[in-house]
């Protein structure tokens, strides 16, 4: 099944889709400005990059759904790790055409959110779940979310980055170590 291109239903879906993307972008910007204000940093410093990782885009060849990936059309790409791993700042590599000009948004989940707490509940106490191997702090008031977003719930981002570089999809220009993680 699906939507017929040019139909009223497809038009309505795309309008809602575009509104959702606009809302998400503004929400990310508002969260960033709020954090910068909290840290007493000038929030007019400018935006380095902003990208969605779940959207539909019309290309010359047809419709492309990027789910968990971003467009290689950006000058800078941020490929986040978990709160316990590095985040990578990259530029698109020479061979992005082999992946429909799409780049992984991150390592991806290894476990469903619903099973995380039962798998690692005994590993952490009340305080250790709120810090990382980098000694960074996690700010979150929802215990279930703390477990659902634990580093163990994600695939190995270093292996993902090695593969992306091996296939010529990205060139890493910097890595970022988490200092503080906010979970809403």
Report residues per predicted region.
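Domain-length cofactor-binding catalytic modules of enzymes
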Residues: 1-184
């Amino acid at each position: 099944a699906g939507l017929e291109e040019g139909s009223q239903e497809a038009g309505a879906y795309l309008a809602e889709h575009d509104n959702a993307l606009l809302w998400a972008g503004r929400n990310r910007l508002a969260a960033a400005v709020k954090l910068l204000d909290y840290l007493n940093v000038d929030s007019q410093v400018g935006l380095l990059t902003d990208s969605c990782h779940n959207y539909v885009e019309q290309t010359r060849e047809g419709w492309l759904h990027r789910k968990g990936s971003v467009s290689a059309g950006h000058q800078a790409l941020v490929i986040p790790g978990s709160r316990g791993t590095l985040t990578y700042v990259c530029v698109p590599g020479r061979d992005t055409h082999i992946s429909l000009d799409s780049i992984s948004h991150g390592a991806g989940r290894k476990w469903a959110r619903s099973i995380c707490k039962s798998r690692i509940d005994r590993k952490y106490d009340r305080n250790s779940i709120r810090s990382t191997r980098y000694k960074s702090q996690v700010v979150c008031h929802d215990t279930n979310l703390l477990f659902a977003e634990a580093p163990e719930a994600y695939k190995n981002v270093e292996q993902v980055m090695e593969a992306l570089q091996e296939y010529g999809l990205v060139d890493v220009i910097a890595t970022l170590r988490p200092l503080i993680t906010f979970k809403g």
